[in-house]
């Protein structure tokens, strides 16, 4: 009997320590805090043709995504899902920026990219840059892409990673996901980032 009570007491203590100790609520996306570099770039914003950097977005939660306007499915679906998240955030959405970086700058000129992002939430901004700038940014966040031009002058596809990165108000990389269909979960994550600092 005494051993049974001792065992029960030990289990209760473990449960109490678990509740009081590492009680941080898990994220819906994957926590990458400390494993990826801070937000840093210098590119042209398609919406107004201005040259912008991470400093333009300091104080806002930034969602970073790489794709291209001729993408048949993943890109429009991802941006539509993120737009739905912004809609759920209501007025908090003004403190969020979704940056869509094109990996196909040859076709995604400033007017083309501006028109494309116009079809989504107004917090979605298109970014483009020279090949060396794009390469540096994709390497910084370990994003893979490959342009496949089989026949010169004909339509081509671009293979690319579908990772979506989340940065807090200080520009620190916090989360990554490839599942933007979990709109409620992402909305909850973004709200936590908005209130964290």
Question: Where are the regions a protein language model picked out?
Answer:
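C-terminal motif of bacterial Sec signal peptides marking the signal peptidase cleavage site
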Residues: 16-19
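N-terminal "domain-start" segment that seeds a small globular fold
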Residues: 24-54, 80
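Short loop/turn microsegments at loop-to-beta-strand junctions
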Residues: 38-39, 62, 161-163
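Short active-site neighborhood of thiol/selenol oxidoreductases, capturing the structured segment around
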Residues: 53-78, 82
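Thiol/disulfide oxidoreductase modules built on the thioredoxin-like
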Residues: 133-189
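Extracytoplasmic/luminal low-complexity segments enriched in Pro/Gly and acidic/polar residues
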Residues: 190-197
């Amino acid at each position: 009997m005494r051993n049974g009570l001792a065992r029960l007491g030990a289990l209760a203590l473990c449960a109490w320590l678990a509740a009081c100790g590492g009680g941080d609520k898990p994220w819906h996306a994957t926590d990458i805090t400390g494993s990826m570099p801070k937000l840093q770039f210098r590119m042209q914003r398609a919406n107004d043709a201005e040259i912008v950097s991470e400093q333009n977005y300091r104080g806002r939660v930034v969602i970073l995504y790489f794709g291209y306007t001729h993408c048949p499915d993943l890109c429009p679906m991802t941006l539509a899902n993120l737009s739905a998240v912004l809609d759920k955030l209501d007025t908090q959405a003004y403190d969020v920026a979704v940056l869509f970086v094109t990996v196909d700058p040859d076709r995604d000129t400033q007017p083309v990219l501006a028109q494309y992002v116009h079809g989504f939430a107004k917090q979605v901004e298109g970014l483009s840059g020279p090949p060396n700038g794009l390469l540096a940014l994709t390497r910084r966040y370990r994003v893979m892409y490959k342009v496949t031009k089989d026949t010169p002058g004909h339509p081509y596809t671009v293979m690319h990673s579908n990772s979506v990165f989340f940065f807090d108000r200080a520009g620190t990389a916090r989360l990554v996901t490839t599942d933007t269909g979990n709109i409620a979960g992402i909305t909850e994550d973004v709200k936590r980032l908005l209130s964290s600092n």
